[in-house]
Amino acid sequence: METLELQGAKLRYHQVGQRPVLIFIPGANGTGDIFLPLAEQLKDHFTVVAVDRRDYGESELTEPLPDSASNPDSDYRVKRDAQDIAELAKSLSDEPVYILGSSSGSIVAMHVLKDYPEVVKKIAFHEPPINTFLPDSTYWKDKNDDIVHQILTEGLEKGMKTFGETLNIAPIDAKMMSQPADTEKGRIEQYKRTMFWSEFEIRQYTHSDITLDDFTKYSDKITLLNGTDSRDSFPQDVNFYINKETGIPIVDIPGGHLGYIQKPEGFADVLLNMWG
């Protein structure tokens, strides 16, 4: 893996291919390896970069998180993630780059576009579970508060079951999300990673400061992506609302919420049709 030293962290990332830079931002998984099957499909067309977000995988913190980062309304980590991606983009290319964020990674991508538009050539938001600008935002904020409370008091299994039911996660995705790692060490790491995401991201990222105006300013750069196998899920509803209010196009892409690993060939074909 490659390393970029930043304030407070050593950011590690996979890099394959040549030509224009395309950065993938992972969601709850946090690590870029989940994009490697997709990267193999695209490496002849892009320099594909798949990031381990700080606090995840091989990326290392060199300074501790501030105590406030676990507060439900803290924007520290999502803003720091966005800054990391912007600094990575600048280190890799003198030109604006392509960016795709999936799930909570798409929320990070939104903040990249909002705060660092100069690094973005084109950007895609794949099934973003953000609620800030929705008419029923308070309802979804309360639901996420309840889910995190349940995870922290009743355990991860019960809380994630509620999470899946509340967001209407598709069976193809629920099966993959509940699949344990192959080794005991892997299972321990998986548990720690999911608990960290639960405490530091479910509430903070989904209710972070993004508005519809942040999209309309740069609508020519944005594509919304919805999976063909995750119909009627909450993240798809978010994209439908953005589309209705701004006219930014939605493109159907193979697979579910984890389509990039479920159907990487078809996923890549759509990206190449968009950006190739």
Swiss-Prot record:
Keywords: Hydrolase. SUPFAM superfamilies: alpha/beta-Hydrolases. GO terms for molecular function: hydrolase activity. It is an enzyme of class 3 (hydrolase). Residues 20-137 form the AB hydrolase-1 domain. It comes from the Bacteria. Residues 57-76 are annotated as: Disordered. It holds the Pfam family Abhydrolase_1. InterPro entries: AB_hydrolase_1, AB_hydrolase_fold, AB_hydrolase_sf. Its EC number is 3.-.-.-. Belongs to the AB hydrolase superfamily. This is Uncharacterized hydrolase SAB2455. It comes from Staphylococcus aureus (strain bovine RF122 / ET3-1).
